[in-house]
Amino acid sequence: MRIIVLGSAAGGGHPQWNCHTLASLRAWQQTDGAQRRTQASIAVSADGERWVLINASPDFRQQILATPALWPQHGLRHSPIEAVLLTSGEIDHIAGLLSMRESQRFSLHASSRVLGLLAQNPIFDAVNPQYVSRQPFALDTPLVLCGLQLTPFSVPGKVPLFMESRSGGDLAGSDEETLGLTIDDGRRRMHYIPGCAAMTDALRARLQSAELVFFDGTLWRDDEMVQLGVSQKTGQRMGHMSIDGPDGTIAAFAPLNVARKIFIHLNTTNPVLDTLSPEFASARASGWEVAHDGLEIAL
């Protein structure tokens, strides 16, 4: 199995277009230890020729330009991307579909909930249904795409930002709002969980002794943005675990014996983005890696 991290940042990328916090400033200036990042997405392949795109980032075109494996290979129109799978209806997971509207055949897979959100907004009709079939999947039921077996499962999260005003106060929504994926090529297995609000017993059991896990790394601390003065929202309010602290991701994973753990979906305020920061050093000392755009892994 081959995995390419197309984008590693949370919504808005790093730096976000209007962010002038220290972490973002270093990315603007591209000082030592700082690297610009696009919004989170990965591509996965069993054979290096046919690829499944996991989430369609608003930075889709930039990510394709940076990834020769995903360039057109033959004919006048072609893409190695044969399927797209969405783990949520968040803007940074669906907006890239609008950059895939050039009548190229691929299959689009998502929960009924997320496909319903797309159907409610006619702008997504630009992704020609004569070429792009929208296929709902059931939770905890494997689907086979491009020689890979992908199993979607529910994790704690919340409704997309643009649906909060319509949620009636129930921000958690249905069990199809926020999903993780188990991806298996018949020999090796990985898990991809770019958003998660809490570690549950079911998730703990699923990840025990896993070979590779990409996991939500949005914030270093729950009140990070509040302390910086850029927002009143905590990580929990946004539907994300934080990396540090007694209830954080590092602590939650400590007893799970996961062989390789990688943070992805990193918010522009997160100090772990700076490879020279003490937070980055702390994460590495705890056995974690921090994803970056262009990271490639062969399992």
UniProtKB/Swiss-Prot annotation:
One GO term of the biological process aspect: pyrroloquinoline quinone biosynthetic process
Keyword Transport: yes
Name of a matching Pfam family: Lactamase_B_2
Keywords: PQQ biosynthesis, Transport
Pathway: Cofactor biosynthesis; pyrroloquinoline quinone biosynthesis
SUPFAM superfamilies for this protein: Metallo-hydrolase/oxidoreductase
Domain of life: Bacteria
Statement: the UniProt record of this protein carries the keyword Lyase: no
Membership in a protein family: Belongs to the PqqB family.
HAMAP family: PQQ_syn_PqqB
Free-text function comment from the UniProt entry: May be involved in the transport of PQQ or its precursor to the periplasm.
Name of protein: Coenzyme PQQ synthesis protein B
Species this protein is from: Xanthomonas euvesicatoria pv. vesicatoria (strain 85-10) (Xanthomonas campestris pv. vesicatoria)
Lineage of origin: Bacteria, Pseudomonadati, Pseudomonadota, Gammaproteobacteria, Lysobacterales
Gene: pqqB
